[in-house]
Amino acid sequence: MGIDKNEWGFRVGHLPHGERNKISDVPGVTVGHCTLADGDIQTGVTALLPHPGDVFHDKVLAACHVINGFGKTTGLVQIDELGTLETPILFTNTLSVGTVETALVKYMLERNPDICETTGSVNPVVCECNDCGLNDIRGLHVTEAHVAAALADCKADFAEGAVGAGRGMRCHGLKGGIGSASRLVELDGKSYTIGALVLSNHATFDDLIVAGTPIHELLEARIPPHEDKGSIITVLATDIPLSERQLRRLCHRALVGLSRTGSACGNGSGEIVLAFTTANRMPHYSDKALLPMEMLHDDAINPLFRAVAECVEESVLSSLLHAETVTGYHGRTVQCLSDL
């Protein structure tokens, strides 16, 4: 979905985007939501499947980068050490990480009877942001059934905005949530895709920049001052054959896209980035000690850096533009950008 120039009057960057302009333009990547929207309860779960197969036995190469570590995402230590992702990536609110992780472990155990029997454990990845402003987060309303529903909902054409884990999130003082975009890159005469998905819950209204324009200069009186705290989770996906080292380099460039929208990465804001490639797989079992692997030459990586910057910038703005105004906990209301 991303940003439609005909609808919003501007476009981000100049690289072409994929058919949907979402992370799901990377073949095999799907996203699903379970949204809880009932009075004081404004929260949910979002799930991302790296590919339609068995991710535990057919792992994807992955990397992560912590820009500012005010966050509780699980699974990063092992990704940083081994360079692989072996479960779906789940997103939820901060206090529901435990419940969601338990549900994800059960999901993996049901599909992989060898885990902790004839092989080792599993590394569940659960990302979070704090939605306590709009959501009764202390009520712990997310259940394992909601996780199962989000996983079952995974598809290529998914919703953005105030849905799933993004239901109660606030971005730049406005209604944020889930945003996504993609870019196409040509290498050796073949087209490849880089996609981004964000869970936006960070930054201040005074810092918001849209298409190079500081928005507070136009609408300053409409949003009360607030601290730069919250978090933003960014996931990058690609079908380009990259090494774990190169994926980490892509993670580092996410900050370029965040800064273009005005993010200053405040003390209380957790900026976490994960990246994976569907091109290079790591089998859980192998009868060979040496595995063949294709890899991009570093001299050809600059277009990928630009693609990441454009995808992340557009994903943040897409999370704002596709959100709706939400009233939640204690009657608090957070306006969406399109209502201003």
Question: Where are each of the predicted segments found?
Answer:
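Alpha/propeptide regions of enzymes that mature by internal proteolysis
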Residues: 1-340
